[in-house]
């Protein structure tokens, strides 16, 4: 009987609408043909999303079954801002290792094995940073995320400097291992703590749908960022050269990280204001 009740509580039409909206939104960014016509799906995605929101409000009001996502979760500032931060952050950070692989293979002529090994120190530092941040997020709150983004952003700026100096002065490309080490360290201190803080104020009965919304924002940000940033790098590299083209790509990532930092600072300010009341 419990299984039957669970099946009856599902929202198949809402699931279909949201699935089609996400598909229409992501397809132009992941379609390898690069046809501009695929971007005509974006208005369709907006229309489908609007239809889904209207349907979810109808389900909430008439209560034939549970809505997929109760829009009440968006009344929590920590959830709204944390989800925004995750989407913007993933739009930038996930493209870094793609750019590193492209630069070392296409720009410098190294093998895929060597290009992949560049990120090993960063991966190790990320695991230690994640452990460190996880133990402190309960006490320090959003400051952990702010510090992580700041460290990662510092690494990105130094990576841009290393790329420019490599082109201008012949500085060894292996300095990037050190700058990317900072990026990895910061990265490890952001993702887990942000998820914890984003969902901390959400009631348990909203936990499943809230986590799904957060993960969807991350996946959409990743798809958009990879398409946008790699397109910028390929266009810049053809027009200029690989070092400066890659530097422009890292500059784009840094801009997105700066936006994520502003969101984190704003959320931290709201939390401090609520605590002071």
Which sequence ranges carry the predicted segments?
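Short, charged juxtamembrane terminal tails flanking transmembrane helices
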Residues: 6, 272-277
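Hydrophobic transmembrane-helix bundles of small-molecule transporters
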Residues: 1-84
């Amino acid at each position: 009987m419990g299984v039957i009740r669970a099946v009856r509580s599902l929202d198949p039409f809402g699931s279909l609408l949201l699935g089609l909206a996400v598909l229409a939104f992501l397809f132009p960014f992941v379609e390898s043909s690069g046809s501009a016509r695929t971007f005509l799906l974006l208005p369709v995605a907006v229309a489908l999303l609007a239809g889904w929101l209207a349907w979810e409000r109808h389900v909430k009001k008439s209560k034939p079954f549970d809505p997929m996502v109760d829009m009440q979760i968006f009344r929590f500032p920590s959830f709204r801002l944390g989800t925004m931060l995750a989407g913007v952050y993933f739009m930038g950070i996930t493209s870094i290792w793609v750019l590193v692989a492209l630069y070392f293979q296409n720009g410098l002529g190294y093998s895929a094995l060597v290009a992949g090994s560049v990120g090993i120190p960063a991966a190790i530092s990320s695991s230690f940073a994640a452990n460190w941040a996880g133990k402190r997020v309960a006490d320090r709150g959003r400051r952990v995320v702010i510090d992580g983004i700041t460290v990662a952003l510092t690494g990105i700026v130094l990576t841009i400097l290393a790329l420019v100096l490599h082109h201008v002065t012949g500085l060894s490309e292996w300095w990037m291992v050190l700058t990317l080490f900072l990026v990895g360290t910061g990265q490890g201190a952001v993702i887990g703590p942000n998820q914890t803080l984003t969902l901390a104020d959400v009631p348990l009965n909203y936990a499943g749908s809230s986590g799904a919304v957060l993960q969807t924002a991350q996946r959409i940000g990743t798809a958009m960022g990879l398409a946008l940033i790699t397109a910028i790098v390929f266009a810049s590299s053809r027009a200029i050269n690989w070092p400066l083209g890659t530097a422009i790509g890292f500059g784009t990532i840094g801009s997105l990280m700066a936006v994520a930092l502003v969101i984190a600072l704003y959320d931290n300010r709201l939390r401090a204001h609520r605590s002071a009341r």
